[in-house]
Design a protein with these regions (language model features):
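Residues that form or flank phosphate/diphosphate-binding pockets in enzymes
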Residues: 12, 138, 213
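Generic alpha-helical segment signature
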Residues: 10, 191-195
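Contiguous beta-strand/loop segments that form the cofactor/metal-binding neighborhood of enzyme cores
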Residues: 50-54, 77-165, 195-209
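C-terminal "lid/loop" region of Rossmann-like NAD(P)-dependent oxidoreductases
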Residues: 179-189
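Glycine-/small-residue-rich active-site loops that bind phosphorylated ligands and cofactors
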Residues: 9, 134, 220
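Short catalytic-loop micro-motif centered on adjacent basic/acidic residues
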Residues: 2-5, 128-130
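C-terminal helix-rich "cap/oligomerization" subdomain common to oxidoreductases
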Residues: 122, 164-168, 200-240
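Predominantly a Rossmann-like dinucleotide-binding segment in NAD(P)-dependent oxidoreductases
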Residues: 3, 8-108, 235
Length: 240
């Protein structure tokens, strides 16, 4: 029995959003965008990164850091792709803003601070997946918007458990012969608490039956990250 703790799946709103997309309620998915915003390089929400080792190592490849992509990119790529399906190809750009050679104590500050990416899914949908540690004004913000030909969904939160219990849904009506405008209203869907990854893992052990997200999913996301590094290095689209 195995499981990978993609912690933002603990959001009950996200789980229900995924069910809605997978059920086909918003129709064929054509476009999406996903963002993960942190600001601990521009604020002291989580401590002083210039003085504390627990933050400094995250900025140094020598100390094992894979930068923003490796730290929070793993979460946003799972968050973005789980409801839609497998990513077919991508084009990514990684950026380190600190000056070359910047160093604090033994930490060379050379890990990527920001990444942007364009993705295309096996079902033909396209979109963007981005993350940064320089998002001033956001502590730990996840955003996902998915657009289909029958509707759309979106979810935004800073904490998966306390704020992730809802998502937004819209089902645009086609323009009628009477000339009425399309309905562009969004409906808030409140969701009951759902199982966390930890609860699912304990249940999987009891039942001796694996559940998601498993090691295969973890390896799948890690492969996406590897392709992002490759794409950024060569400056081209790469197949997954």
């Amino acid at each position: 029995i195995n499981m990978v703790n993609f912690s933002y799946r603990n959001s009950s709103g996200y789980q229900e959003l995924c069910k809605m997309v997978k059920s086909g309620k918003i129709g064929n998915v054509f476009h999406m965008d996903a963002n993960y915003y942190q600001s601990w390089l521009t604020s002291n929400y989580w401590g002083n990164w210039k003085e504390e080792d627990k933050w400094l190592w995250r900025l140094s490849t020598k100390h094992g850091s894979k930068g923003t992509l490796g730290d929070i990119g793993v979460h946003i790529f799972d968050f973005a792709s789980f409801p839609i399906g497998k990513i077919k190809k991508l084009n990514a750009h990684l950026k380190t803003f600190k000056s070359k050679g910047d160093k604090i104590k033994d930490y060379v500050l050379d890990a990527n601070d920001t990444f942007i990416s364009m993705v295309e899914f096996e079902n033909g949908a396209i979109g963007t997946v981005n993350a940064t540690r320089f998002a001033t004004g956001y502590k730990n913000r996840l955003e996902l918007r998915i657009f289909g030909d029958k509707g759309a969904v979106k979810i935004e939160f800073d904490d998966a458990i306390t704020e992730g219990n809802k998502f937004m849904f819209t089902k645009d009506t086609q323009r009628q012969l009477s000339g009425k405008e399309d309905n562009l209203k969004w409906e808030e869907i409140q969701c009951e608490p759902s199982q966390t990854n930890f609860e699912k893992f304990i249940e999987a052990i009891k039942n001796n039956k694996n559940d998601e997200p498993d090691f295969y999913r973890g390896a799948e996301i890690q492969n996406i990250l590897d392709k992002c590094y490759e794409s950024s290095e060569i400056g081209k689209w790469v197949n997954i």
